[in-house]
A protein has these predicted regions:
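Post-HExxH zinc-binding segment in Zn-dependent metallohydrolases
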Residues: 36, 296-306
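Generic structural signal for hydrophobic core residues of well-folded globular domains
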Residues: 6, 63, 78, 118, ...
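C-terminal leucine-rich, beta-strand-based interaction scaffolds used for sensing/assembly
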Residues: 219-300, 313, 317-342
Length: 343
């Protein structure tokens, strides 16, 4: 959100790069965005070194240690450049020339104000609206931000309630008269959507089949949902009570209307991806090991910390710690351990 605000209001030339696009190098990632003479490496290097362009690199936590090292080396080499990088909490060594800023959790009043600000975007037929909705928000925050609970759990609650995506889900659920479970938000939202899916389409939500298709989609680095096969699913996910996906419409070269659906946030996609990792089948157990170093499935392991049976989660914790020791990459293991403690 901050980067979006920064880019929209900048008066300078800005290059936005997802960190995943920098696996070959930052200069190479910029070149891929340009055409003609502007692609010249020497020309680009002069622009960057002189501070003529700003560079935003987003999502360092979503890439391998090798890619992060390339980005850090670039930043240290162009120390006069205007470069901003973002990451979720991560154990790493920033470039020696970098200045670090930490986003602080929202205060209770700020969380309350955000929830109230969602009212105009809530479904028109929401069960709880107006003053009743405001009171529901107050009551809920008083309960979940109870200072009598363990500090670690309270810190985890504040982190979740400082995430606009999670807060929006909380607002939607409160407006429906539900009690959000902050540590299982996506699962809770899915259960509500699946129950309505069954009522509307007279059949169970095809969770296993849809999740397998999403896993394949992720492996192929595709973004659009396989809507040809799951049109009813896409329609239910897009319902304004859940807003789990968003759609984009356009006309093709023949003037025919086209429409595609995309997950509104990676956290929602991760919920469906994690279904492939759950259960006692050989396939599920194999994925737990095979995808451990795949940054595309980082969020899946965080969900596993809360969704796996406790003994299985503890076993996976040890495997992740061993993996981190072997690879010197603890981007997943540290957060997994913290999440597991909340249980």
């Amino acid at each position: 959100m901050f980067l979006r605000h920064l880019l929209q209001n900048s008066q300078r030339i800005v290059v936005y790069l997802p960190a995943q696009k920098c696996h070959k190098g930052v200069i190479e990632a910029i070149q891929d965005k340009l055409h003609g003479q502007a692609q010249d490496a020497g020309f680009l290097k002069n622009l960057i070194y002189s501070g003529a362009i700003d560079i935003c690199i987003d999502g360092l936590n979503e890439v391998t240690a090798e890619t992060r090292a390339k980005i850090c080396q670039f930043v240290e080499s162009y120390f006069r450049g205007n470069i901003i990088m973002t990451t979720q909490p991560l154990e790493w060594t920033p470039p020696s020339t970098a200045k670090t800023y930490y986003l602080q959790p929202l205060e209770k009043q700020q969380i309350q104000e955000f929830l109230i600000s969602r009212q105009p975007r809530l479904p028109k037929e929401a069960k709880i609206q107006g003053a009743d909705y405001a009171q529901a928000c107050t009551n809920y925050l008083t309960e979940v931000l109870n200072h009598q609970q363990a500090k670690e759990e309270l810190d985890a609650v504040r982190r979740i309630l400082s995430n606009p995506m999670d807060l929006t889900v909380v607002a939607l659920m409160l407006s429906q008269g539900k009690h959000p479970n902050l540590f299982r938000l996506q699962e809770q939202q899915y259960n509500l959507m699946a129950a309505e899916y069954q009522q509307e389409w007279k059949q169970e939500f095809p969770l296993k089949r849809f999740s397998a298709a999403i896993y394949q989609m992720r492996l192929e680095d595709k973004q659009a949902l396989p809507a040809d096969e799951f049109h009813q699913v896409a329609m239910s996910l897009e319902d304004e009570k859940y807003k789990m996906v968003v759609s984009r419409q356009w006309q093709d070269e023949k003037g025919e209307a086209k429409k595609e659906w995309y997950f509104r946030h990676d956290k929602i996609m991760d919920f469906f991806l994690v279904q492939n990792f759950l259960g006692e089948t050989d396939a599920a157990e194999g994925l737990l090991v095979d995808r451990m170093g795949d940054t595309r499935f980082r969020g899946v392991y965080f969900l596993l910390a809360t969704l796996l049976p406790l003994d299985a989660a503890k076993e996976l914790r040890e495997d992740l710690i061993q993996y981190a020791a072997d690879t010197k990459d603890n981007t997943v293991s540290n957060t997994f351990v913290q999440l597991l403690r909340t249980r």
